[in-house]
Curated annotation (Swiss-Prot):
It catalyses: tRNA(Trp) + L-tryptophan + ATP = L-tryptophyl-tRNA(Trp) + AMP + diphosphate + H(+). A motif ('HIGH' region) lies at residues 82-90. It is an enzyme of class 6 (ligase). One of its GO terms (molecular function) is ATP binding. It is found in: Cytoplasm. This is Tryptophan--tRNA ligase. Its main location: cytoplasm. A motif ('KMSKS' region) lies at residues 253-257. InterPro entries: aa-tRNA-synth_I_CS, aa-tRNA-synth_Ic, Rossmann-like_a/b/a_fold, Trp-tRNA-ligase, Tryptophan-tRNA-ligase_arc. It comes from Pyrococcus abyssi (strain GE5 / Orsay). It comes from the Archaea. Belongs to the class-I aminoacyl-tRNA synthetase family. The gene is trpS. Gene3D superfamilies: HUPs, Tyrosyl-Transfer RNA Synthetase.
Length: 385
C-alpha cells in the first residue's frame, strides 16, 4: 500500500503515517475550522476525540455541518462485525458517535454484520456470529445511546436490508469491487456481494448520512459515493478515526485474536492489572537511573497513547504527565499504575451499564420509536430495483 504500512478493511499492519493515508485514500484533513464550527453549532466543548485529533480525516463533513445549519439535518450510521468479544479499541468510536447523536439530536443506525463475519471468518459458524452479535450489542447499548433515536439491527434478522442491497449490487461491477477490496479468484461469492449490504443503510433516510468509523472502513463508502446520486440520494459523508494501538506495540491496531494485546470490555480488574503490567509497551529507559537523567519518551509509549486517546479527559493533566515523563520525574511503573486505575474505573461502570442493557435490547432492536419505524417502513422507491 503506502510505504511500510498496510491498511485495508480487514487488516492493519505497521506504524501508520496518517498524513500519507489521507493522500492515498483521497480524503481531507479534519481541520481546526471544521472543529470550531462543530463546537459553535453544538454549543459544546469538543470531546477529547476531536480535541486531540483522534478523528483526523473526513469526506464531506463540511457539507454535513452546512446541512445541519440550514435545517436539512443528517443521520448517523455505524456498525460492528461480531466475531468475538469487544475490546477498548472497538468501543471508542461508539463514544464519539454517542456525542454526535446527543449534541445534534439525530437518528443513529447501527448495523451488526453477523452475516459478514460468517462469510469472512473460516473458523466461525453462523451460530457463533449470532451469539457474538448479542454480546456485542450489550456493550454498544452500554455506551448510552438514545433508545428512541437508535436502531440496532442484525443483518440476519432485518432481511429488508437484502431487498435494498439488490439494486445497489446492480450498480457495482466486479472490476469496481475488485479494485477497491482486492478480491481474487479465491474470494467467496458472498464476500463479493457483501459491500452492497454494508452500503444499504446509507440510504435509510433522504438526508446525508455521516459515518464515524476507523479509516480502514473507508473503501465501502468510496463505492457508495460513485453511484448514490444516480439513485437520488446524497453521497455519504464520513469522519475517520485513527487506530487504537495494542498494548504491545504502536504499530497496527488492537486485535481481539491476540488476547495479550487487548483489554476486553468484560475483563476483570485482575485481568487489567495483569495485562498492563506484563504487556504494555512504555517509552522508558533501560534503567531507573537513565530514566531520571534522560527522561522518558512518551511518543513511543502505549501507556501514554491510551491516556491521550481515551483515559485522561483533562488536557492539563495529560500535558503535565507528558512533561513529567520527558523530564524524568515519572517512572513507567507510576504511569502503568495510573492507567490501570483509569481502565478499571471505566470497566466497572461499563459493566454495570452492560448488565442493565439486557433489559433494553428489545427497545433498541424492535420496540423503540426508530426501531418500530424501520420495521414498518416500506423499501424506498429508488431501491426497489
Amino acid at each position: 500500500m503506502v510505504e511500510d504500512f498496510k491498511v485495508t478493511p480487514w487488516e492493519v499492519e505497521g506504524v501508520v503515517d496518517y498524513n500519507k493515508l489521507i493522500e492515498h485514500f483521497g480524503t481531507s484533513p479534519l481541520t481546526e475550522e471544521l472543529l470550531e464550527k462543530t463546537a459553535e453549532l453544538t454549543k459544546s466543548e469538543l470531546p477529547l476525540f476531536f480535541r486531540r485529533k483522534f478523528f483526523f480525516s473526513h469526506r464531506d463533513y463540511d457539507k454535513v455541518l452546512q446541512d445541519y445549519e440550514e435545517g436539512r439535518g443528517f443521520f448517523l450510521y455505524t456498525g460492528r462485525g461480531p466475531s468475538g468479544p469487544m475490546h477498548i479499541g472497538h468501543i471508542i468510536p461508539f463514544f464519539a458517535t454517542k456525542w454526535l447523536q446527543e449534541k445534534f439530536g439525530v437518528n443513529l443506525y447501527i448495523q451488526i454484520t453477523d452475516d459478514e463475519k460468517f462469510l469472512f471468518k473460516e473458523n466461525l459458524t453462523f451460530e457463533d456470529t449470532k451469539h457474538w452479535a448479542y454480546e456485542n450489542i450489550l456493550d454498544i447499548i452500554a455506551v448510552g445511546f438514545d433508545p428512541d433515536k437508535t436502531f440496532i439491527f442484525q443483518n440476519s434478522e432485518f432481511t429488508k436490508i437484502y431487498e435494498m442491497a439488490i439494486p445497489i449490487a446492480k450498480k457495482i461491477n466486479f472490476s469496481m469491487a475488485k479494485a477497491v477490496f482486492g478480491f481474487t479468484e479465491q474470494s467467496k461469492i458472498g464476500m463479493i456481494f457483501f459491500p452492497a449490504i454494508q452500503i444499504a443503510p446509507t440510504f435509510f433516510e433522504k438526508r446525508r448520512c455521516l459515518i464515524p468509523a476507523a479509516i480502514d472502513q473507508d473503501p465501502y463508502w468510496r463505492l457508495q459515493r460513485d453511484f448514490a446520486e444516480s439513485l437520488g440520494y446524497y453521497k455519504t459523508a464520513a469522519i475517520h478515526s485513527k487506530f487504537v494501538p495494542s498494548l504491545t506495540s504502536l504499530s497496527g491496531k488492537m486485535s481481539a485474536s491476540k488476547p495479550e494485546t487487548a483489554i476486553y470490555l468484560t475483563d476483570s480488574p485482575e485481568d487489567v492489572e495483569k495485562k498492563v503490567w506484563k504487556f504494555a509497551l512504555t517509552g522508558g529507559r533501560p534503567t531507573l537511573k537513565e530514566q531520571r537523567e534522560k527522561g522518558g519518551e512518551p511518543e513511543k509509549c502505549v501507556v501514554f497513547k491510551w491516556l491521550e486517546i481515551f483515559f485522561e479527559e483533562d488536557d492539563k493533566k495529560l500535558k503535565e504527565r507528558y512533561y513529567a515523563c520527558k523530564n524524568g520525574e515519572l517512572t513507567c511503573g507510576e504511569c502503568k499504575r495510573y492507567l490501570i486505575s483509569k481502565i478499571q474505573e471505566f470497566l466497572k461502570e461499563h459493566q454495570k451499564r452492560r448488565k442493565k442493557a439486557e433489559k433494553q435490547i428489545e427497545k433498541f432492536k424492535y420496540t423503540g420509536k426508530l426501531a418500530q419505524e424501520m420495521w414498518d417502513k416500506a423499501i424506498p422507491e429508488p431501491l426497489k430495483g
